[in-house]
Every structure is written in structure tokens, then in C-alpha cells.
């Protein structure tokens, strides 16, 4: 496998993860009215917010 193929596969994997994350975000938004889940969502938000900042920085560097 050459480098192009390797990176194509890696980016395809990353895309799948981001698509799944988008679906989870939609679920979290729809469930925010449930107070029993709020604390868990806060934890998830903190973790995901760190990830989003990294992705935004990456996008800005490559544009």
C-alpha cells in the first residue's frame, strides 16, 4: 500500500468517526430536556469541545 492509499484510508476512517459524532450530537441536543442526563452531557461536552478545538485549528492551518 502506498502512502496515498494509506492516508486515504486514514481520512476515510476519520470521516466515519466525525459522521458518527454528528449523529451523537444530534441525539444529545434532542435529549437535553432530561435533567438526569445533564451531568453526563456536561462531561461529554467538555471532552468533545477539546476535540472540536483541535479540528478547528487543523482546518485553519490547512486552508
Predicted feature residues:
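Non-heme di-metal
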Residues: 1-63
Amino acid at each position: 500500500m502506498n502512502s496515498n492509499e494509506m492516508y486515504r484510508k486514514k481520512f476515510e476512517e476519520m470521516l466515519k468517526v466525525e459522521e458518527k459524532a454528528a449523529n451523537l450530537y444530534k441525539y444529545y441536543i434532542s435529549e437535553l430536556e432530561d435533567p438526569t442526563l445533564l451531568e453526563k452531557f456536561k462531561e461529554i461536552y467538555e471532552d468533545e469541545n477539546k476535540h472540536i478545538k483541535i479540528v478547528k485549528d487543523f482546518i485553519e492551518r490547512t486552508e
